[in-house]
Amino acid sequence: MLEHLRATDPIIADLIEREAQRQRQGLELIASENYTSLAVMEAQGSVLTNKYAEGLPGRRYYGGCEFVDAIEQLAIERACQLFGTSHANVQPHSGAQANIAVFTALLQPGDTILGMRLDHGGHLTHGSPVNFSGKWYNVHFYGVDAQTGQIDYDDLASKARAIRPKLITSGVSAYPRIIDFARMRQIADEVGALLMADIAHIAGLVAAGEHPSPVGHAHVITTTTHKTLRGPRGGLILMGDDFAKQLNSSVFPGTQGGPLMHVIAGKAVAFGEALRPEFRQYAAQIRRNARALAEGLMAQGLTLVSGGTDNHLMLVDLRSTGLTGAQAQRALDKAAITVNKNAIPDDPQPPMKTSGIRIGTPAVTTRGMREPEMAQIAAWIGEVLMYPDDEARLNRIAGEVADLCRHFPVPADMVQVRG
């Protein structure tokens, strides 16, 4: 499939092939990563990348949009069907762009927002001082209970009463437990706040009924379209009639220009795939695998924040091992096991070191792995973290990982990337 690229730019072609090899021979345990289908990749690699289409279907600023109109309309309809909403905007280039559009539509600079602390599992776009959200708005934070590691809803409610925020965000990037959207809406209503649910990590679980839905609770919902949803990298906004017009205008012309029609086509394909019964089976297996992996890690003597997981990810507290998250990530990389360093609640380490690692099961579940493989993966992780500097041991494990991966190849579409 790369014959034209090899002829034009062999350096890039070689790097792509090497990345494909890395994905085939290693275990991808980064909670935000997954493998798309060949159908999604074909849509993204199509002639749609050539087409400008500013505006919405039927209301474009360019001619020649009859076919991209049909594609975007399908993406909108499938997204609404998948999540049970009346309106969707499929144009955001990313989850961050979706959040920017929501904030600029619903807030004025200086308005007060209440978001989850980044080191407690929140996200940069929910008020971090290094992000636009922390620079433009008056931000206050809630977090998790120190004993349980779960969201402290009583403290959240107390803070909301004290500061009377314009917007409360319920969204996470490293939180392993179920989010109580109904309780969040109750708190928001009590103080007259709007509720935004950022379900970027759990969208696939929500769509499949494996996590409670924010629909009917949140005033607006944002998400990415990859991660557990297994689509192309991009963003999505879901909403009802009350905010549809202003949110659509906030995406275009408010914060973006021309939409990426090839990515929107990929989103439409992915939404269609997620509407099939087998996607529900896939999402259920993600959670079963996560529970099995969490149990295996705890059996290795490792500590998990909150003591386990209800969704697709878990957060390992490494302080008892003497390793930082960065050190653990490097050692696991050498063993062909990919994770990411991640802050734990009230982490004493700086962001580039951290005291934890985040682990997720969406990608290995796509490969067809199940609970027995999770037990083996947990054993490998435990061994690596016990002997992080034993190069011979790490090389042996990398070989064993490659052997396992041969029995559970990445989707056939990925293999075809080799040509």
From Swiss-Prot:
Positions bound to (6S)-5,6,7,8-tetrahydrofolate: 118, 122-124
GO terms under cellular component: cytoplasm; cytosol
Catalyzed reaction equations: (6R)-5,10-methylene-5,6,7,8-tetrahydrofolate + glycine + H2O = (6S)-5,6,7,8-tetrahydrofolate + L-serine
Pfam families: SHMT (PF00464)
Keywords from the named record: Amino-acid biosynthesis, Cytoplasm, One-carbon metabolism, Pyridoxal phosphate, Transferase
Site (Plays an important role in substrate specificity) location in chain: 226
Assembly behavior: Homodimer.
Entries under NCBIfam families matching the protein: PRK00011.1
Name of the protein: Serine hydroxymethyltransferase
